[in-house]
Amino acid sequence: MIYENLDSIDRTKAHRAKLTLLCEARQGTRAWVRVRLDDLSQAGFRITWLPQFSLGMPLRIRIPSMQVLTASIRWHSGKTLGCEFAEPLHVAVFEHIVRNAVIDGPLSR
């Protein structure tokens, strides 16, 4: 498993993994859309491509082999969104997702 523990200054204060994982996301009653999850921590994630998103509306994400999770969009840049989980992932859940994803290497900042 490739991830790094960020120092206490980082706002996520959690393990972080750079990975590639195809998921589905939606807001409200909109249709599910395929998105690429590129970055994951216990606190949140970064996805690419969610057309017509709304910053104030909760986002639901379906990660393979997981229940639907709820998150809030915290930032966006072009087709990339940074999201925070409504409830942080338990470390065992985080490690399960990372183990089942394609690992690109540790995230460097």
Predicted regions and their residues:
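Short, solvent-exposed secondary-structure boundary/capping segments
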Residues: 45-49, 79-88, 92-93
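N-terminal helix initiation/capping motif
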Residues: 1-40, 91-109
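Short beta-strand-centered aromatic/proline hotspots
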Residues: 34-36, 70-74
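Short conserved beta-strand and strand-loop elements enriched in small hydrophobics
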Residues: 21-26, 56-65
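Short, conserved beta-turn/loop elements at beta-strand boundaries and strand-helix junctions
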Residues: 28, 42-43, 76-81
